[in-house]
Amino acid sequence: DRVIYDRIRAGRPVLGVCVGEQIMFEHGLEHGAHAAGIGLIGGSVNLLDADVVPHMGWDTIEAAPDSVLLNGVENERFYFVHSYAAMEVKPADTSRFDIDLSDSPERVSWCSYGRSRFVTAYEHGPLSVTQFHPEKSGDAGSQLLKNWIATL
């Protein structure tokens, strides 16, 4: 986690995918056990509320209107394979890591599955994460990765 904090503090882009998104939150609950996350995003990760878990396959998303990652692919489908997700974003106290992102807007994109509406992409300063797998999401995923690379 120190390497991630150092990169964010220096303004160097970080991309987390799937579990890479989940660990950025403050904490999570999996199989009844609480685990601390890195804490760069406020909130927790929990089991999806759906009749069938995991959420596996192609799905549409609700892209944040000003998303940098999802620019040009707002109406596309992305590939998911996960059982846990964050259902909300809360303010995170990143000052304890000597990180101040207060000048950067938070961009939150969403997806719905079963009875859950969850964070599917989050962008805040140099931090970008996705719950879906861009590397498995065809042309839309390739464009997302190109968008992220352009931030380097």
Model-derived features: positions:
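Cysteine-nucleophile active-site neighborhood
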Residues: 1-57
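Amide-donor transfer/coupling interface in amidating biosynthetic enzymes
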Residues: 6-9, 43-152
